[in-house]
Amino acid sequence: MLDAVAIACDHGGFALKEALKVALPDVQWLDLGTNSADSVDYPDFAGKLADAIKAGKAARGILICGSGIGISIAANRHAHIRCALAHDVTGARLCRQHNDANVLAMGGRMIGEAVAKECVEVFLNTKFDGGRHQKRVDKLGSC
């Protein structure tokens, strides 16, 4: 696994974020908040995670909001982020193998803790296949 993994959420993802930190104690988490179930704005926390990756504090990140949709959209507004929304292990694996995703988004109201844990483990331990997928990922930089 990686040295540090950034994790951030809004209020809809707070419970799952905390559960993942307990379920995966061997991960060196860089917790960027939020730190309660009080209502906050997901773009703020997607931005904090994107900034941490850009600064080299973490190579990959996990983002969680209620559905995973809003926070993934916000993350992908940052040019150096390739955020994929996944609610199953297949999506978590393929976003690494084919798309070299550096951020995994999930919905705290959409996915159970056990599946989320599996998704994070697969995401962190799957390598990018490169090859024919590399030219496609390279084209993302010109969008």
Regions found by a protein language model. Give the residues of each.
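Charged helix-capping and loop-helix junction motifs
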Residues: D44-G47, A86-D88
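Mid-chain, well-packed structural core segment of small domains
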Residues: L63-R109
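Short, structured active-site "lid" loops
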Residues: F45-L63, S67
